[in-house]
Structures are given as C-alpha cells and as structure tokens.
A protein has these predicted regions:
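Core subunits and conserved enzymes of cellular information-processing
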Residues: 1-131
Length: 131
C-alpha cells in the first residue's frame, strides 16, 4: 500500500456512506494521532486501540445525530499525497470552510490541527481536511 492515510480516510468515508456504527482500521502511530484529533474535535464518538497481532487495529465509533441520522463528518479529504506533498507555513494555513472545518498537519512538534499550529507559529505537511 503506497498511502496508508488515504486508505484510512477511505475506510472511514465508506463506513459513513454505509451507515456503519463502528469501523476497524489497521493501526499506526500516525493513524492513532489523527483519530485522537478527530475525537477531540467531536467528529467521532469514541475510539479504541486493540492489540491483536503485530500491528493492532483501531476501532472507531462514528458519530451520528440521533434525530436526523446525519453524520458529524461531511467530508474527509486527503490533501498531501505521496506523489505531491503539500507543505504550508504558519502564516498561510489553509482555511477549511472559512474556519468551520479543520486541517490536520504533521509538524516537527507532532500531528495537530491548523489552529494549534498557527498558535505555535509552526508549519508542516497538510495531511487532510475534515468538515
């Protein structure tokens, strides 16, 4: 697999489109950090790391509105790909839907959102955008 982050986002998108409550994805440190950010920002209901085998899996519980059955995640988009890396400085962070969504960056200080990176005045690789 050439792009495990794109595979992770695609698994989440497919589970959302199929109205699944829980999705299991192969674990990695980067996927754990992205999942943690999605949980902290309220895009997913819960997550759990399961150590089964050499790699382990992450069980992600997706968040739906009980009244309308609408998902909290409207769009998951991969920005930087292995063939075309996208980097940004702290002065020109990408704005996702005028600040309503988040961009997830990989920086020298770790994986964080665009707002956190702007406050710390550091740039990095834009992994994905979520709204």
């Amino acid at each position: 697999m050439t792009d495990p982050i794109a595979d992770y986002l695609t698994r989440l998108r497919n589970a959302i489109m199929a109205n699944h409550r829980v999705v299991e994805v192969p674990a990695s440190n980067l996927k754990k950090e992205i999942t943690k950010i999605l949980f902290e920002k309220g895009y997913i209901l819960n997550y759990k790391f399961v150590e089964d085998g050499p790699q382990g899996t992450i069980k992600v519980a997706l968040k739906y509105d009980p009244a309308t059955k609408a998902n909290a995640i409207k769009c998951l988009k991969r920005v930087s790909t292995p063939g075309l890396r996208k980097y940004t400085g702290y002065k020109n962070m990408p704005r996702v839907i005028n600040g309503l969504g988040i961009a997830i960056l990989s920086t020298s200080q770790g994986v964080m959102t665009d707002k956190e990176a702007s406050q710390l005045k550091i740039g990095g690789e834009v992994l994905c955008s979520v709204y």
